[in-house]
């Protein structure tokens, strides 16, 4: 009796992101917001396992999430397979490492990694090309960013991306006290005040990052979240007390970050903060630049 070899399992890394500054310039008539944000991928994130199969299945480990059309990974896989006219499917296993609804783009990154993985597994035929960025945008405004594999200036509603490749090394600590904030709520709270902002000062930010001094960035969503989610202020204060600088909320929250001067300081601050705040999600990380390829972190 002969045994068929098991399908090869492909591993893809789905990096978290932070916003090194997020300016909301205004709101459109359709309810979408115009943004100006420096988005950067990090060395921490979720992991995706994928292997070819006859049908599409999804299993999630590390979080209680749906495994059908309600899950963005499943929708991304279904969208790509349909667009490419692929005859097969895939067994997907998502290992969640990032906290949910945390401002780190975890779901969007997972979806982008799914698209990249399936494009490698089931390349679209020449007569039926798949526009991955366009497909990604149908899944969410942040998803196209994660196809780039590097830092980018995001404009429009987040769909206009300009790669940024001249950032210095950036070391940081991420912390989340356990709160979840939906992006919809964060933007609604901003709309209630109408406190929109001007564009980020990118050159000043680059210079400050290179010098390791306080970075002149801001997050337009932060004030509204602070007024309603007290643990975010506690998190920002804890990061500053740990000796980190330029503390800021990432995206719509509730994860916050502070910058360190080097990897050693980041690791020490993360260890001290985790000990002082048991139950928090805390980790050291660095900006994932540059990437050697655009594979989404395949290993």
UniProtKB/Swiss-Prot annotation:
ATP binds at residues 99-109. The active site is at 17, 142. It comes from the Bacteria. Disulfide bonds: none annotated. Its EC number is 2.7.1.148. Pathway: Isoprenoid biosynthesis; isopentenyl diphosphate biosynthesis via DXP pathway; isopentenyl diphosphate from 1-deoxy-D-xylulose 5-phosphate: step 3/6. It holds the Pfam family GHMP_kinases_N. Keywords: ATP-binding, Isoprene biosynthesis, Kinase, Nucleotide-binding, Transferase. GO terms for biological process: isopentenyl diphosphate biosynthetic process, methylerythritol 4-phosphate pathway; terpenoid biosynthetic process. It catalyses: 4-CDP-2-C-methyl-D-erythritol + ATP = 4-CDP-2-C-methyl-D-erythritol 2-phosphate + ADP + H(+). It is an enzyme of class 2 (transferase). This is 4-diphosphocytidyl-2-C-methyl-D-erythritol kinase. It comes from Deinococcus radiodurans (strain ATCC 13939 / DSM 20539 / JCM 16871 / CCUG 27074 / LMG 4051 / NBRC 15346 / NCIMB 9279 / VKM B-1422 / R1). Catalyzes the phosphorylation of the position 2 hydroxy group of 4-diphosphocytidyl-2C-methyl-D-erythritol. One of its GO terms (molecular function) is ATP binding. Belongs to the GHMP kinase family. IspE subfamily.
């Amino acid at each position: 009796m002969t045994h068929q070899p098991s399908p090869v399992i492909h591993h893809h890394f789905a990096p978290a992101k932070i916003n090194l500054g997020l300016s909301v310039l205004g709101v459109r008539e359709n309810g979408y917001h115009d943004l100006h944000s420096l988005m950067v991928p990090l060395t921490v994130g979720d992991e995706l396992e994928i292997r070819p199969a006859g049908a599409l299945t999804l299993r999630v480990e590390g979080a209680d999430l749906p495994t059908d059309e309600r899950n963005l990974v499943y929708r991304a896989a279904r969208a790509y397979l349909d667009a490419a006219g692929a005859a097969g499917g895939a067994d997907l296993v998502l290992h969640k490492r990032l906290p949910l609804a945390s401002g780190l783009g975890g779901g969007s990154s997972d979806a982008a990694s799914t698209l990249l993985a399936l494009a490698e597994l089931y390349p679209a035929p020449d007569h039926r090309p798949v526009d991955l960025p366009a497909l990604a945008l149908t899944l969410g405004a942040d998803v196209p960013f994660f196809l780039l594999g590097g830092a980018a200036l995001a404009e429009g509603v987040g769909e206009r991306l300009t790669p940024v490749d001249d950032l210095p090394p950036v070391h940081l600590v991420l912390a989340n006290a356990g709160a979840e904030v939906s992006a919809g709520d964060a933007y609604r709270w901003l709309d209630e005040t109408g406190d929109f902002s001007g564009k980020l000062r990118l050159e000043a930010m680059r210079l400050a990052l290179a010098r390791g001094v306080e970075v002149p960035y801001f997050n337009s969503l932060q004030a509204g979240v602070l007024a309603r989610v007290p643990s975010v202020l506690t998190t920002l204060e804890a990061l500053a007390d740990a000796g980190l600088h330029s503390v800021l909320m990432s995206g719509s929250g509730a994860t916050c970050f502070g910058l360190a001067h080097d990897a050693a300081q980041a690791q020490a601050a993360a260890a001290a903060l985790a000990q002082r705040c048991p139950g928090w999600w805390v980790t050291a990380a660095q900006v994932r630049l540059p990437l050697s390829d655009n594979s989404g972190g395949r290993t």
